[in-house]
From Swiss-Prot:
Seems to be required for maximal rate of protein biosynthesis. Enhances ribosome dissociation into subunits and stabilizes the binding of the initiator Met-tRNA(I) to 40 S ribosomal subunits. Residues 8-82 form the S1-like domain. This is Translation initiation factor 1A 1. GO terms for molecular function: RNA binding; translation initiation factor activity. It comes from Haloquadratum walsbyi (strain DSM 16790 / HBSQ001). Belongs to the eIF-1A family. Keywords: Initiation factor, Protein biosynthesis. The gene is eif1a1. It comes from the Archaea. PROSITE patterns: IF1A (PS01262), S1_IF1_TYPE (PS50832).
Length: 96
């Protein structure tokens, strides 16, 4: 057994070229949240319909956000990490 298997870590979804890590800071309602992104920007992110009522997003959740091309202060949430996955990302130094 390797060290990775002993710790229980597994492959995590990493951001694509147009995605950034973010932490949810505020729930705005109407399927919108405020997120603090790893690139230093604070954005209003939209929870897409495919995630509504299937994947519940709360404050302090770690998510992936795809900023809009035409309006950089807004974006779409594309992925939510479980608590254990977020802890693993913090241990690896990918997020704070």
């Amino acid at each position: 057994m390797s060290d990775d298997e002993n710790r229980g870590s597994h492959d995590l979804r990493m951001p694509d070229d147009d995605e950034v890590f973010a932490v949810v800071t505020n729930m705005l309602g109407a399927n919108r949240v405020t997120v603090r992104c790893a690139d230093g920007n604070e954005r209003t992110a939209r929870i897409p319909g495919r995630m509504q009522k299937r994947i519940w997003i709360r404050e302090d959740d770690v998510v992936l956000v795809e900023p809009w091309d035409w309006q950089d202060e807004k974006g779409d949430i594309t992925w939510r990490y479980e608590k254990s996955e977020a802890d693993q990302l913090r241990e690896e130094g990918r997020i704070r």
